[in-house]
C-alpha cells in the first residue's frame, strides 16, 4: 500500500518489560527483512516525539525507493493517558504535515 507515515505510541521497553519489537535500524544503519532493505537516514527529537526517516527498497526493483517517516511518541504511560495534551497535538500536526495529500493509509 506504500504507506509513508508510521505513528508509534509505545516505548520499546517500559518498567523492565518489552512492549514492542524495535523493527527499525539505528541512525545511519540499515537492516534487511527478506527482500526489503531499510536504511535509517535521519533522527530528530521534538520534546516527547522522535521523528525517524527511513528509506525502503527492494534490491530486485532497482530505482524504486520509498521514504517513510515514523513519529514515535515516547511518553504514553503503560496504564492511563498522558497528563498533558500539548505533545499529542504536536504529534497530530507533524503527522498531518508529513502525510500531505498522500492517499496511502497511516500505520499506527
Curated annotation (Swiss-Prot):
Query: Its catalytic activity?
Result: O-phospho-L-tyrosyl-[protein] + H2O = L-tyrosyl-[protein] + phosphate
The residues the record assigns to binding substrate are 78
Tyrosine-protein phosphatase domain: from which residue to which, for each copy? 1-108
Which terms does the record give in the GO molecular function aspect? protein tyrosine phosphatase activity
Catalytic activity, EC: 3.1.3.48
Q: Which UniProt keywords apply?
A: Hydrolase, Protein phosphatase
CDD domains, A to Z: PTPc
Which family does the UniProt entry place this protein in? Answer: Belongs to the protein-tyrosine phosphatase family.
What name does UniProt use for this protein? Tyrosine-protein phosphatase 5
Amino acid at each position: 500500500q506504500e504507506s509513508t507515515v508510521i505513528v508509534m505510541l509505545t516505548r520499546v521497553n517500559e518498567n523492565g518489560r518489552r512492549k514492542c519489537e524495535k523493527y527499525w535500524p539505528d541512525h545511519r544503519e540499515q537492516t534487511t527483512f527478506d527482500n526489503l532493505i531499510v536504511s535509517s537516514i535521519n533522527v530528530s527529537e521534538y520534546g516527547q516525539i522522535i521523528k525517524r526517516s527511513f528509506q525502503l527498497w527492494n534490491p530486485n526493483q532497482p530505482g524504486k525507493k520509498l521514504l517513510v517517516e515514523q513519529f514515535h511518541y515516547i511518553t504514553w504511560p503503560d496504564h492511563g493517558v498522558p497528563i498533558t495534551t500539548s505533545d499529542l497535538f504536536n504529534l497530530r500536526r507533524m503527522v498531518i504535515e508529513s502525510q500531505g495529500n498522500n492517499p496511502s493509509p497511516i500505520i499506527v
